């Protein structure tokens, strides 16, 4: 006679997984709700680009409605290093300028951005300076502008290339050329033209971005040779 085996099936409902504490109130759904309530606060998408896990790393920022992108070179891919960029921007920009660009940040859940308080609060002064939200896991399409603009970086700094020759001055030069490239999405104007129309040339200069004449723009590896 065959042995009968009884399997007890639990009817206990599975609990919905809670968001990690650092992301509570900062999810992409929270971001969409925040944008509905604050439609006049522009979003700045933030990301990191690198070729090797050992670095170096380029922290990128792109400003809503402009396609204007800047980058900060880092040796370390940590929240301490990445949030320090905001400290430097605060030191360099006026309060009005900082708030116009960095009040609202949208990024992914990389470990280098995983300490939201360090981005939202100036740890030196205790001042609340920004609001940060995070895309859902593995959903880079939720910050499409910064992701798409990285294609320009890859034209100049191809995958697999050693980046140890990079300096912040070279990064600034690269983004000056990228921002001086006309875009169909901008009515064939350049990100530099749109950004300076909205914010002024002085602010672009403070961000170390210069206008490059269209016939002098180079978006190939030759630029940084």
Q: Regions from the language model: what does each represent?
A:
Residues 1-148, 154-162, 167, 173-177, ...:
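Secondary-structure boundary/capping micro-motif
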